[in-house]
Amino acid sequence: MLLRDILFVLITTVAVYASIYAPQPILPLLAGEFGLTTSGGALLMTAVLLPLSFAPLFYGLLLESQPAKRMLLVTIAALALLQAAFGAAESYGLLITARLFQGACVPAILAAITSYLAYTVDREHIQRAMTYYVAANILGGFVGRVLSGWVATNAGWRYTFYLIALALAGCFVAVTRMKADSRLSLSSVRLSAVMPILRNGDIARLYAVAFTIFFAFMALLTFLPFRLKEIDPSYTAFVISMMYSGFLMGIVMSVGATRIIGLCGGERRAMTIGLVLFGISMLLINVPSGAGIFAIMFVMCGGMFFVHAVAMGTMNKLATENRAVANGLYISIYYTGAALGSWLPGLIYQSAGWAAFTLTLTAAIAGAVVITRGLRFSG
């Protein structure tokens, strides 16, 4: 695989994840402008995550019979137009509609990217390739949030989405220059391809861990802006967006995941350590201080994204056949967790408060630790 093509794939990943998470730090602002409740504002995240929860499996299956590059070109173009539509929307209904259609495009792009990597990178290097992919999606989430907060504070929130649309247009041009993924199998699409993957107990457990960590993490990220407004109503969108700076630690941990796995003595132990850090930071996030939350987010993001990088890389090593399907299923499962987490725990937050909310999420993370200890491969 050409280094240039890897760079194009990673830049596209950054732009796509920026498009997903850009609204998150400005949810209180959007809720105020459109007269929404906390849960109504959170639905702007659920709307894009819900299609992500079931569409990736279909796209993963389709990629066993279609070139990933072709799907990338079609869906990147559509996503760019939908970002511009979100920026121009004048009603809550149009915002939700644009987000739903964005959610239909994003999983196609992500499944195409992971499949492109899986089929064009040598098996010996797939773990490292996937950790760089995870690092790119973390960077994209961070860039999208900070860009959104800064632009909303200084120029108006709509310009964020016009800028993202332009970035995606640039990605479209870059993808046209990528080498075709000729090694993809042109087999027929069969849903039965899913069952052999799920029969692998270790892969099934990795899927369960992915569901749980994204459920807890997305819940925290979605409702954190509202919590910060409770702590200090004077916080601007940019100040709130900077609370996501901990994502930078997630990049470091993901890129270094392969080396850290060796230091920990294997994937299972490494994932357990990451989950424990994630759980402890979820308890500490109760501190009623913006500065404290800022610091804790570095630990939380480092632990969570390390677990994600290890789980995804390990799953690709264990999936000896139909990797596009395995990746599509992984994306589907963890975004199912994210979609549920972006709304359901908010009911606890609204009715019982922040402490009950974070305790519930900590209990979910503890469940992921139990699942991880049941993994049968070495380490």
Show where each model-derived region lies.
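Juxtamembrane intracellular "pre-TM" segments in multi-pass secondary transporters
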Residues: 178-207
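Helix-to-loop junctions at the C-terminal end of transmembrane segments
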Residues: 55-67, 253-266, 349
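Cytoplasmic helix-loop-helix junction between adjacent transmembrane helices
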Residues: 98-137
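Paired small-residue
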Residues: 78, 82, 93-102, 291-299
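Helix-loop-helix hairpin linking two adjacent transmembrane segments in secondary transporters
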Residues: 123-177
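C-terminal transmembrane helical hairpin of 12-TM major facilitator-type secondary transporters
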Residues: 267-311
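Helix-breaking motifs and short loop linkers at transmembrane-helix boundaries and internal kinks
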Residues: 35, 67, 88-94, 105, ...
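Conserved MFS/SLC helix-loop-helix module at the cytosolic interface between two early adjacent transmembrane helices
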Residues: 54-91
